[in-house]
């Protein structure tokens, strides 16, 4: 089997935050083509009513799987996967879905102070899935859940080159920093794939140094473990497609996609 015969990997997000995962996945799976799908017509997911979002994502994947027949699907969105992951697997049992969930377990293993914060969207914060992760893996820690209404949009603007005021960003991340009994938060879980693009800004504005935990590499490793590696291959050249459900990404977004080796196609 040649690399041209291999099925592509589909990476899905509500916007362009999933590019953080795509970047890592390409490093580990150089023999594969990728399809990046941004449901920008539904962005942001954090404020959606749960039933409506489930229906939207499940229906969208019906179309995507029929058209592209991928090897696996990476759901590079905490909000989507914590809500719809089980339903996607039930609706499409023939497909393998690799999910993105808040990196609470590794945070609990690494913290020295026992104070961990999870910076997420409101949707991820309120999910029972997230609270179950805390109960299962971080019950010995004090975990602060911080649901930002604005950071995903701000990250999209930042990635496109727009300037953000420091005080506005600081207001979003400030609740992550907790002092208790002489201890301080030492790990912040970035529980939205958009947020790692702003990690340098977060580091600069943070009241004190913390470990910002980005799950992208772990997601890519999990995907690699599920994708068969052919014997003898050469890394692929050429651009992969990016699909935006709105059908009309702006110029800055198209330019960004080119920087990631992606060519925008109509949905």
Curated annotation (Swiss-Prot):
Signal peptide coordinates: none
One Gene Ontology term of the molecular function aspect: glutamate racemase activity
UniProt EC number: 5.1.1.3
Keyword Cell wall biogenesis/degradation assigned: yes
Gene Ontology biological process terms in this record: cell wall organization; peptidoglycan biosynthetic process; regulation of cell shape
Keyword tags: Cell shape, Cell wall biogenesis/degradation, Isomerase, Peptidoglycan synthesis
Function: Provides the (R)-glutamate required for cell wall biosynthesis.
Protein name: Glutamate racemase
Organism of provenance: Sinorhizobium fredii (strain NBRC 101917 / NGR234)
Name of the gene: murI
